[in-house]
Amino acid sequence: MSFKMKRTLEMRRVESAFVDYLENEDSIDLLWSDKVGYVFLTINEKTHQSESCEDLHTAPQLCRRLLDDMAITVMMQTKRNHNFTNMDKDEAVRVRAFWKPVIEKLPDYAYLCDEILREAQENEEENGIDLQ
């Protein structure tokens, strides 16, 4: 007996909220597999080879992973060469602004933004950074 993943309407709703971001971001792709669900690929922009993949089985997982990637995109634009776990207050404001169009479509997932920034803040508490 073969197992088949089911792409729920909620998963499709989450994917559609990120469609503009996915179309404009060359370093990632999102694929659907009936065997494993959504597959999030990171792509090396120089070699055009996949670097990693992650299986995502639920709408919250999918949304969280894409919000994480959006935050990383903002951090890379700062050219400070660090990830979002080291962001400062101004960068947190930029990340929230970048997330805004998606969260307007998915207000029930706004809590994920808070979780991401809270985790970043917890990682930086020893440095006295306040991301709120």
Which residue stretches match the model-derived regions?
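Acidic, low-complexity, intrinsically disordered interaction modules
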Residues: D34-A120
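Negatively charged, low-complexity tracts enriched in Asp/Glu with abundant Ser/Thr
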Residues: S2-E25
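Short, exposed beta-strand/loop patches in secreted or surface proteins that constitute
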Residues: V19-Y21, I28-W32, C53
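Short, surface-exposed beta-edge/turn micro-motifs
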Residues: E25-I28, V36-Y38
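Non-Sec secretion/translocation targeting segments of pathogen effectors
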Residues: I129-Q132
